[in-house]
Amino acid sequence: MLFRSGAGALLKDVSEAAAQSSLTGLEFACGIPGSIGGAIFMNAGAYDGEMKNVADTVRTVDREGNIHTYSRDELDLGYRHSRFQDNGEAIVEVELCLEPGDSKAIRAKMDDFTQRRESKQPLEMPSAGSTFKRPKGYFAGTLIQETGLKGLQVGGAQVSTKHAGFVVNATGNATAADVRGLIHEVQQRVYEKHGVMLHPEVRIIGDA
């Protein structure tokens, strides 16, 4: 069944709307921050689910105002990647292919994912979600923790003491420069200790 949404809708709201319609496939997205357009742009995923599994059609507008429509096979969705990171087009509408399911089972799965997130992730503090991509053969949070960087702070930005894979706004007034500086410091120290270069999962646009 096709489920259509404007790209600006919050991903968690789309996940909730799908659940209320007894449609399964988007439960993994219930706690991922950002819009559904952003989720397609980054091929967001969690708990063995990703947008690649449910995306059916994406409509975009280019710099000249032309509308383009892409089918599932044309999206080039990979680990935190889509074709839209390369072609400069803005996503305006998304159609997802979801399956009819049992509403109680869908809700139970979403509740389980929410509880797991709340127990392990610093959801009580502002952040942009998971900060670094998962390097092949490793987990970014584990490498950062083993380097002893939990609690490391640059200005108002801090490596979360709850989950080292998150950079949080610990003081409430962290700047983009603070976050960028902390990301750079973490990259350097992890590389020096483990020989692994971490790459940001967040997109950095412009100068901080």
Identify the role of each PLM range.
Residues 7, 30-37, 44, 128, ...:
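Short glycine-rich loop/turn motifs that provide flexible caps or phosphate-binding loops at active sites
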Residues 18-56, 127:
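A gly/ser-rich beta-alpha-beta helix-loop segment of oxidoreductase catalytic cores
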Residues 5-23:
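A short, flexible low-complexity segment enriched in Lys/Arg and Gly/Pro that occurs
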